[in-house]
């Protein structure tokens, strides 16, 4: 059973994939999107779902620190609903508070350069989100 993890931003979607046992998450890629033009990366996500035989998708839900959901969280919920309807798969929302900060700390501790961090931060945030979900099971 493979699970896809997504960190949805305004310009990119970070993508992570679980191993076949559903124990560990690995960064896969970063998909460029354009919300204003209605390009959300659904075609590429659909390709990945087919390629890896994905059973479930976990989408990060950016909550405010007080637990409320703001405009970005609402946009992620709509993204998840669109994915659910398009792919007919289970899509789970997962609290992603501080996932980007955690990813940044991981990359800094691994001595990754600032330039390289900028290129992989969304993918790493997706790993943090997906690994959090996997660890909860």
UniProtKB/Swiss-Prot annotation:
Primary residence: cytoplasm
Top-level division of the source organism's lineage: Bacteria
Enzyme class: hydrolase
SUPFAM superfamilies: Ribonuclease H-like (SSF53098)
GO cellular component: cytosol
Signal sequence region: none
GO biological process, one term: rRNA 5'-end processing
Pfam families: RuvX
Gene3D superfamilies xrefs: YqgF/RNase H-like domain (3.30.420.140)
GO MF term set: nuclease activity
CDD domains linked: YqgF
Record-listed E.C. numbers: 3.1.-.-
Subcellular location, record wording: Cytoplasm
PANTHER family: POLYNUCLEOTIDYL TRANSFERASE, RIBONUCLEASE H-LIKE SUPERFAMILY PROTEIN
Its biological purpose: Could be a nuclease involved in processing of the 5'-end of pre-16S rRNA.
Protein name per Swiss-Prot or TrEMBL: Putative pre-16S rRNA nuclease
